[in-house]
Amino acid sequence: MDKYIGKRLDGRYLVDELVGIGGMANVYKATDVSNGRIVAVKILRDEYVQNGELLRRFKNESKAVALLSHPNIVRVYDVNFSDRVNYIVMEYIDGITLKEYIEHKGILDWKEAVYFTVQILRALQHAHDNGIVHRDTKPQNIML
């Protein structure tokens, strides 16, 4: 069992379940016990906490996303950086990834492909307009 499941982060975020595994962090579904809101908590993996470069990238990601406000970009609610655990609390999207959608549906028709592409490009344009380049844009990182 994952060491974070069932635990509270800083007495506020009750970690419910693991929902995603990334290259340097895991994403959990959690409950903000202060208001009952369901959130996503991205926790930097323990093996990377002592890696200065990866920790810097993780911190930069949280700062960058926190500055963005766009309907196609998840909101950041909170961040924590400490010796114990480093995490970003974000809006929870109850859905599937674009990768999962394509695997289930198969080849997209052109109208659907254009629709998704426009939404993705609007989000990326907003990020670029704010000086941010998303370095990991791929179907498994896009929630529907």
State each model region's role.
Residues 16-22, 27:
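Protein kinase glycine-rich loop
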Residues 20, 60, 69-72:
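Flexible N-lobe loop architecture of eukaryotic-like protein kinase catalytic domains
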Residues 31-38:
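Conserved N-lobe loop of protein kinases adjacent to the ATP-binding glycine-rich P-loop
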Residues 45-67:
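AlphaC helix of the eukaryotic protein kinase fold
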Residues 79:
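Activation-segment/catalytic-loop signature of the eukaryotic protein kinase fold
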Residues 83-97, 101:
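Conserved short submotifs of the Hanks-type protein kinase catalytic core
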Residues 116-117:
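Activation segment signature within eukaryotic-like protein kinase domains
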Residues 120-132:
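Protein kinase catalytic-loop region centered on the HRD/HxD motif
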